[in-house]
């Protein structure tokens, strides 16, 4: 069995790490490189960086900090933000990223997933999916341009259908960003994760809602996700990664303990 992964998420805006609640009202957390170093030293398995306004601004992620991060950490990291072409992805990988993640650009042009997978291999192509639970219809819907609350909009895709589609097109991993839970720290949406796990045959990463060590355990044990991504609990030092991994290991979760 592959070890489960703990993945700090760093949302980047104007060259700094920020964090919002339900993708709104972002506050500045700190500088990119020192935070990346801290998480690597604490025992993170991987880091994810989202340049959250790149797609909505019509630009590609700023590559200058990508190379700086690559110089100071020795764990894999994934970068997302406005990657619309094979060439965009190639530059970010050349600057030192191990994976690239696409979200809104994949919704605009689903063939991009296949072109990236064909060129660089499925192992480094991640598709991020921003999913919103609508109580009225009791359904999960995919949103795009979520980095800018003024431009955020619903798509015509139901989350389940989009998960199936991106796998057919060559996604090597899926990060499910559960918008309702984002930043509120009351637990991952286990119902949604369990439902999507049944149709997701590539690694599935849970994102949105972690507030306690028990929440990570529930995601791994009850929904069988491959990794758990979190931001605010790590940024605000509510949870220490090393202590979290020790707890998970004691609970029987297969995980790399530092």
Curated annotation (Swiss-Prot):
Its EC number is 4.3.2.10. Pathway: Amino-acid biosynthesis; L-histidine biosynthesis; L-histidine from 5-phospho-alpha-D-ribose 1-diphosphate: step 5/9. Gene3D superfamilies: Aldolase class I. The active site is at 11, 130. CDD domains: HisF. It is found in: Cytoplasm. It catalyses: 5-[(5-phospho-1-deoxy-D-ribulos-1-ylimino)methylamino]-1-(5-phospho-beta-D-ribosyl)imidazole-4-carboxamide + L-glutamine = D-erythro-1-(imidazol-4-yl)glycerol 3-phosphate + 5-amino-1-(5-phospho-beta-D-ribosyl)imidazole-4-carboxamide + L-glutamate + H(+). It is an enzyme of class 4 (lyase). HAMAP family: HisF. Heterodimer of HisH and HisF. Belongs to the HisA/HisF family. This is Imidazole glycerol phosphate synthase subunit HisF. It comes from Yersinia enterocolitica serotype O:8 / biotype 1B (strain NCTC 13174 / 8081). The gene is hisF.
């Amino acid at each position: 069995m592959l070890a489960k992964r703990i993945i700090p998420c760093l949302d980047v805006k104007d060259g700094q790490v920020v964090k919002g609640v339900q993708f709104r009202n972002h506050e500045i957390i700190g500088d990119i490189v020192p935070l990346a170093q801290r998480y690597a030293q604490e025992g993170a398995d991987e880091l994810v960086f989202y340049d959250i306004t790149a797609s909505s601004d019509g630009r590609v992620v700023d590559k200058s900090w990508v190379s700086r991060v690559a110089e100071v950490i020795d764990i894999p990291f994934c970068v997302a933000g406005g990657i619309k072409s094979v060439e965009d992805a190639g530059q970010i990988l050349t600057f030192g990223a191990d994976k690239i993640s696409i979200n809104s650009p994949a919704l605009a042009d689903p063939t991009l997933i296949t072109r990236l997978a064909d060129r660089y291999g499925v192992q480094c192509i991640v598709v991020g999916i921003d999913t919103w639970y609508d109580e009225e219809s009791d359904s999960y819907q995919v949103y795009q341009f979520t980095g800018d609350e003024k431009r955020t909009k619903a798509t015509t895709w139901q989350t389940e259908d989009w998960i199936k589609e991106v796998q057919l097109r060559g996604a090597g991993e899926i990060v499910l960003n559960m918008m309702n839970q984002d930043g509120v720290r009351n637990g991952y949406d286990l119902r949604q994760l369990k439902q999507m796990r049944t149709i997701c045959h590539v690694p599935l990463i849970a994102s949105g809602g972690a507030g306690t060590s028990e929440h990570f355990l529930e995601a791994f044990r009850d929904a069988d996700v491959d990794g758990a991504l979190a931001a605010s609990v790590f940024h605000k030092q509510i949870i220490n990664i090393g202590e979290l991994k020790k707890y998970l290991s004691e609970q029987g979760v297969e995980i790399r303990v530092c």
